[in-house]
């Protein structure tokens, strides 16, 4: 094949989950040329045809086809002209060949035209147009090669998020596995393609599927040193799970190809918008339809978590099921305001020691809960900023609130110290007060002992007197 066709392309069925470097070199082969004039002329025509294809010479390709060159000519390694055209994602040539009758479902050793297009050496926009053209000619997106890899896996491996979305919209099985158990999500995670991972999660990819060696996509990302993807894939709740799963094919394609201006002609997809904490919470509960409503009313996650039923109605959340979902989630998260009104009242000077002790114990328990909550947040926050997957607001707001918290904690500490000193002073004054009335239990203990002894003595004398009289009468 021509020198420009010497690009490395994935071999038909020669892919491996352990090494993505298995390629074919479809360049020249060192072998002596044919000597017969007929075969020499044919080889020259084939060589000219291949050069025209790889250089994108549309007029020459059409001229050769008009002169009798077959649209299904077999080049080196059994490749057809269409295979060569999609390998460089030349949309115009692909369209010409298809219009001339080229087979969009052709495969060489189970390596299909569509697979070659997904692994092409070109820009994603060109690959996207090529793939869409092939799909319009009934190319099957679920055919697998000898290693059980499908076109969506090739696209995910190469990092083409838009191509992945288009294939899935046309019915590609998103959770299919190759011979080593890799899915499209696993391939994207392995190569660190964040945009593809996000798109696959949005399309409903299952991140819990394991490879044959028992690894999930997140663990594969971690093993290949992609900590950001590992963090994203390790989230308990998938904020993007299956957003487009329940759409029809036409609706999904429309959603995926919706852009501004002339972007629709260029088949560009809207970029992924990072999720904030409110969006993650709502998506986790299946309440993503409330996102716009809450944003319009400037309701933050913190405000949402502290709302009551009457607050929901006032803010337009009228669906009882939606209200209950939020309330159940709040209860599960144990997010609640400290209601000091429920603590024991201590303003009464006649309060008993048991009630006062109960108040202090409750206050101490609340402080312990707050400390544990802060410790949990510290343990969950990543050390490095590049590991943060979800969008955050200005860090200045967070640090400002933390500074206020520190001041409040210091004030609380000072007040508790004052309370402790006051209690200690009261105890010391009571001990040193000469007019102090002894506790009732002290007197009761001494009196009870005296009464017991007196009673025992009287009973003893009475018993002896009775015995003495009885003996005297008998005698």
Swiss-Prot record:
Tell me the InterPro entries matching this sequence. Ankyrin_rpt, Ankyrin_rpt-contain_sf, Asz1_SAM, SAM, SAM/pointed_sf
Q: Where are the ANK repeats?
A: 44-73, 77-106, 109-146, 147-176, 180-209, 213-242
Instruction: Mention any one GO cellular component term assigned to this protein in its UniProt record.
Output: pi-body
Question: What is the annotated localization of this protein?
Answer: Cytoplasm
**Keywords attached to this entry:** ANK repeat, Cytoplasm, Developmental protein, Differentiation, Meiosis, Phosphoprotein, Repeat, RNA-mediated gene silencing, Spermatogenesis
Instruction: Report domain SAM positions.
Output: 273-336
Q: Name one GO biological process term.
A: spermatogenesis
* SUPFAM superfamilies attached to this UniProt entry: Ankyrin repeat, SAM/Pointed domain
Chain intervals for the UniProt region annotation (Disordered): 1-24
UniProt keyword annotation of Ribonucleoprotein present: no
Write down which residues bear the modification named Phosphoserine. 16-17, 19
Is Phosphoprotein among the key words of this record?
Answer: yes
Q: Name one Pfam family in it.
A: Ank_2
Oligomeric and partner information: Interacts with DDX4, PIWIL1, RANBP9 and TDRD1.
Q: Which PANTHER family does this chain map to? A: ANKYRIN REPEAT, SAM AND BASIC LEUCINE ZIPPER DOMAIN-CONTAINING PROTEIN 1
What is known about what this protein does? Answer: Plays a central role during spermatogenesis by repressing transposable elements and preventing their mobilization, which is essential for the germline integrity. Acts via the piRNA metabolic process, which mediates the repression of transposable elements during meiosis by forming complexes composed of piRNAs and Piwi proteins and governs the methylation and subsequent repression of transposons. Its association with pi-bodies suggests a participation in the primary piRNAs metabolic process.
Name the chain's protein. Ankyrin repeat, SAM and basic leucine zipper domain-containing protein 1
Please give the organism.
Answer: Notamacropus eugenii (Tammar wallaby)
């Amino acid at each position: 094949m021509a020198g420009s066709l010497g690009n490395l392309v994935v071999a038909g069925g020669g892919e491996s989950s352990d090494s993505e470097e298995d390629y074919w070199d479809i360049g020249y082969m060192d072998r002596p040329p044919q000597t017969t004039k007929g075969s020499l002329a044919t080889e020259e025509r084939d060589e000219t045809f291949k050069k025209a294809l790889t250089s994108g010479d549309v007029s020459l390709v059409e001229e050769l086809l008009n002169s009798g060159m077959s649209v299904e000519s077999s080049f080196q390694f059994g490749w057809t002209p269409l295979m060569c055209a999609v390998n460089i994602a030349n949309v115009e040539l692909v369209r010409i060949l298809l219009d001339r009758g080229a087979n969009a479902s052709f495969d060489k050793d189970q390596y299909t035209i569509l697979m070659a297009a997904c692994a092409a050496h070109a820009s994603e926009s060109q690959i996207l147009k090529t793939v869409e053209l092939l799909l319009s000619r009934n190319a099957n997106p679920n055919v697998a090669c000898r290693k059980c890899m499908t076109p969506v896996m090739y696209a995910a491996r190469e990092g083409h998020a838009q191509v992945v979305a288009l294939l899935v919209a046309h019915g590609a099985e998103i959770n299919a596995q190759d011979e080593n158990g890799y899915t499209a999500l696993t391939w994207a995670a392995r190569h660190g393609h964040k945009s593809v991972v996000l798109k696959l999660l949005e399309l409903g990819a299952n991140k819990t599927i394991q490879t044959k060696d028992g690894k999930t996509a997140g663990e594969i990302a971690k093993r290949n040193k992609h900590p950001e993807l590992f963090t994203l894939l390790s989230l308990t709740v998938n904020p993007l799970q299956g957003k487009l799963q329940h759409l029809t094919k036409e609706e999904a394609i429309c959603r995926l190809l919706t852009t501004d201006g002339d972007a629709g002609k260029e088949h560009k997809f809207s970029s992924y918008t990072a999720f904030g904490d409110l969006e993650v919470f709502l998506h986790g509960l299946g309440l993503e339809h409330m996102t716009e409503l809450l944003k319009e009313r400037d309701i933050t996650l913190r405000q949402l978590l502290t709302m009551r039923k009457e607050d929901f109605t006032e803010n337009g959340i009228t669906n009882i099921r939606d209200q209950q979902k939020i309330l159940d989630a709040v209860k599960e998260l144990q997010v609640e305001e400290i209601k000091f009104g429920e603590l024991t009242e201590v303003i009464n000077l006649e309060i008993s020691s048991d009630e006062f002790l109960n108040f202090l114990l409750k206050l101490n328990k609340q402080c312990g809960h707050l400390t544990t909550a802060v410790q949990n947040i510290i343990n969950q926050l990543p050390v490095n900023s590049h590991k943060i997957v979800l969008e955050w607001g200005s860090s200045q707001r967070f640090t400002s609130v933390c500074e206020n918290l520190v001041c409040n904690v210091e004030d609380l500490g000072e007040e508790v110290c004052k309370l402790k000193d006051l209690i200690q002073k009261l105890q010391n004054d009571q001990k040193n007060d000469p007019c102090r009335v002894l506790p009732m239990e002290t007197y009761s203990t001494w009196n009870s002992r005296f009464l017991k002894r007196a009673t025992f003595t009287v009973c003893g004398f009475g018993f002896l007197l009775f015995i003495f009289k009885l003996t005297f009468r008998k005698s």
